[in-house]
Amino acid sequence: MNPLRRKRLLIILAILVGVGIAVGLALSALQQNINLFYTPTQIANGEAPIDTRIRAGGMVEKGSLKRSGDSLDVTFVVTDFNKAVTITYRGILPDLFREGQGIVALGKLNADGVVVADEVLAKHDEKYMPPEVTKALKDSGQSAPTPAKEG
């Protein structure tokens, strides 16, 4: 084989191997960072994977918020008005977190059907509702409740 042709072949092979490694690393990173959204109904029906990072969202049930007296542990129930799921969280809840309003929790579903959240996102004004929560409420035949005016 001609030395010039051999050199070109090695360069092309090196480029192909490099591109293959880059694509593999990119796909691996994307796979680890994908957090699929599940409604409380889907979680209760067993559609959400256990011990995999997910997003769970819905409306916080009134009267379900329980705070630990000696730690930052919080437990509350989220519903899509069909079924409900319990969420536990250790940390400070967002200022806009309220019972009766929409939230999205990021965490893992344990074997008991409880979402152990490491992040809780609250809706940030009266008009905004996460698209997934809006769709879940619409599918259940409910509409997002209008918050009471404060003041």
From Swiss-Prot:
Keywords, in A-Z order: Cell inner membrane, Cell membrane, Cytochrome c-type biogenesis, Heme, Iron, Membrane, Metal-binding, Signal-anchor, Transmembrane, Transmembrane helix
Entry's Gene Ontology cellular component terms: plasma membrane
A Pfam entry, by short name: CcmE
Membrane topology: Single-pass type II membrane protein
Record localization: Cell inner membrane
Family under the similarity heading: Belongs to the CcmE/CycJ family.
Binding site residues for heme: 124, 128
Known function: Heme chaperone required for the biogenesis of c-type cytochromes. Transiently binds heme delivered by CcmC and transfers the heme to apo-cytochromes in a process facilitated by CcmF and CcmH.
GO biological process: cytochrome complex assembly
GO molecular function per UniProt: heme binding; metal ion binding
Domain of life: Bacteria
Listed InterPro entries: CcmE (IPR004329), CcmE-like_sf (IPR036127), NA-bd_OB-fold (IPR012340)
Gene: ccmE
Gene3D superfamilies assigned to the protein according to its UniProt record, in alphabetical order: Nucleic acid-binding proteins
Residue ranges, Cytoplasmic side: 1-8
Segments passing through the bilayer: 9-29
Topological region Periplasmic: 30-151
Species name: Pseudomonas fluorescens (strain SBW25)
UniProt-listed HAMAP family: CcmE
Protein name, UniProt field: Cytochrome c-type biogenesis protein CcmE
